[in-house]
Amino acid sequence: MAFVAASILPFSSCSDFLDREPITKPEAGNFLTGAIQVENYINGLYMTLPSFSKFGLGVRSEEKNSDNIIAEKYDARLHGQNNQFSGASDWQTGYQNLRKVNYFFHNYKVPEAQENEDVLSLKGEAYFLRAYWHFDLLKKFGSIPVMDAFWDENATIAGLQIPAKTRNEVARFILSDLVEAKNLLHSRGKYSGIRINKEAAMVLAMNVALYEGTWEKYHSSDDFASSTNESNYFLGEVINWGNELFGCGIDLYKTGQNPGDAFAALFNSKDLSGMGEVLLWRKYSSDEGVFHDVNGNLKAGVVDSEGAAGITQSLVDNYLNADGTFIDPTNEKFKDFKETFEGRDPRLIQTVMNEGAKFASATTATPMHLEEYTDEKKNTISPPKLAGDGNTRSLTGYHIRLGIDTTFVSGNGETALPIIRYAEGLLAYAEAAAELEMWSDDIANKTLKALRERAGVKYLAPAKDANFTDFGYTLTPVLQEIRRERRSELALQGFRLDDLMRWKADKLIGGKRGKGAYVGDESILFKSYSPDNQKRIRERLTLDDNKWADPMAGTLPSGYQFHADRDYLLPIPPSELELNKKLKQNPKW
C-alpha cells in the first residue's frame, strides 16, 4: 500500500489557534470508533513522513545543507544568512503534524472489546508519529513546548501560555512515546516494512537518544547546553534499545556477486519488502498514481534541482580503500578522476558517478567514460557535465549515482524510498558504545565490521588517520572510524546536517566551502572535453591554486559565515513569542 491519502484537517501554527473553527467537540460521527475509521485516519498521517516529490530530487539533494554537496543556491543557514523568520515554516509544519496526531488521540473511541492487535498497532503508529515530529522540532529548535494533547481546547490567550520543556525533557517524552509505540506495534514482517513497525520504533528511539546524548556532551559548555547534562543517560538508552533490537533477528541485506551490489539495491529497487534491513519504506507505483521524478533528474545529471551543484571532494575523500586502509588525499593519483575510484570502498562507486556507470538504462545512456577527446571518439566519450547548463551542470565533476534505476528509460519514477534502516541502529549503537568507553571486539563485530564487510570493505582495527577531518577536538581512533562510517553509509540520505549539529562541528563549516575534482590542463577529466567545452569550463569554473575545482570561490570568498554562537538552532518565530510569553528565544536570535 502506498500511503498518499489526502490531509483530513486544515492545520496551522499555534498562533492561529484563536482564529480556527473549534473542533474539540466533534459530531458523534467524527469519533474514531472502528478499525476502518482508525486505519483511514492513520493512513492520512503517512503523508507527513519523508517522500520523493513529483518534482526534484527530495532527500538526494538535501545535503547541500552540509559539506557533502556544494550548490550555486547554497544553504542560507550555513552562510549565516538566516533571519528571525527562518524557523517559521519548520515550526508551523511540526506543530501542524502534531495537531493531526493529537486529533487522533483526542477522538479515539474504539471500544475495548474491539481493540484487537491490528487496531492497537495503528494506535502505536500514532505514538510513533508523535515522537517523530517532536524529534524533528527538538533537532531544529531545542527546548520546545511538548504537544502531548489536543491544544484546540486551550484556544484562548491564557490557555496557550505553555512553557517550553528543556531539551532533555523533550527527549525523554519522545522516548516514552516510543516505548508506547513499541509495545503496541506489529513487527516488520506483518506488512514487510510498508507500515510503521516495532523495529522501526526501536531504531528511531536509538537515533533520538544518540542525538540528545551527543548534543549534551559536545555542547556542554556553550549557550546551547541542556540545563541538566544527561549525556550518559541518553547514550545508555541507545545501548538499551539496541540490545533489544539485536534480539529481533534482523540481518543486513546481502546479495549480488560484486561488492556494493547489496548496498546499491537498497536505493535503486522498486520493491524493498524482501530486504529485512529496510525497516520502513515508501512504495511508488504509477499504476496507483504514486510516482516521482527522481529518476528523470538523476538521468540528466542533476544534483540540485534549484541550480548547478556537485558532490564535494570532501565526501569522496571520506571513503576508505577496499582493503580497509586510509587514503592519502594528497597522493598525486587522485588527480586522475578514474583512479580516484579504483580500489576504493564500493559504496563510493555506488554513491558517486564514475567510469563505466550509467545515468539511466543501458539502451538509452552512454556509460561515463573519460578519454582524451578526438572527433573520432566523441560518441563514446562521456565525461561529467562540467560544461552543462542550468541544474544539469556539475560544479565539482561528481554526480549522484545513489538511487539511479538503470532500468529507467523515461516517464515516471518508481524506485522505493527507505525511511528507516537497520544500519542506522548499528551505527548508533557503535557510537554510543564508543562515547561511553564500552567499545569491544564483540561490539565491533556486530556493528562497524558487519557494515564494512557487507559493503565489500575489509575491517581493520581502528587506528589514527592523520588526514581525517579535524573537528577542532580530539577523537579516539574508534570514534574517528565511526564518524567516517556514518558519512559513508548514510551519504545523501539526509543525516549529515544533524550529525554536524550534534557534534558541534562548526569548524567544518565556518570559513570553508566545498571543492571538487582536479581539473588541471593535463588531467584526463579536462582532456575528455571538446575544445569548445574546454573553453566553456575555463570561463565558468574557478580553480584553486592547485587546479582543484573551487566553484564557489567568487560567491563565498571567505567560505561559509556560519555563526557558531547562533546557527546551531533555528529562531522561534516572532509570532509565537508574541502569543506565548512563556517561550524564550534561542541564543543570539
Where does each model-flagged region fall?
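An aromatic- and glycine-enriched ligand-binding surface/loop that stacks and positions planar moieties
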Residues: 15-74, 105, 144, 148, ...
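Long, intrinsically disordered, low-complexity segments
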Residues: 94-97, 173-175, 259-321, 412, ...
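Conserved, well-structured interaction surfaces
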Residues: 34-50, 71-141, 157-193, 337, ...
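Structural register within alpha-helical repeat arrays
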Residues: 123, 130, 205, 212, ...
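C-terminal substrate/ligand-recognition segments
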Residues: 341-453
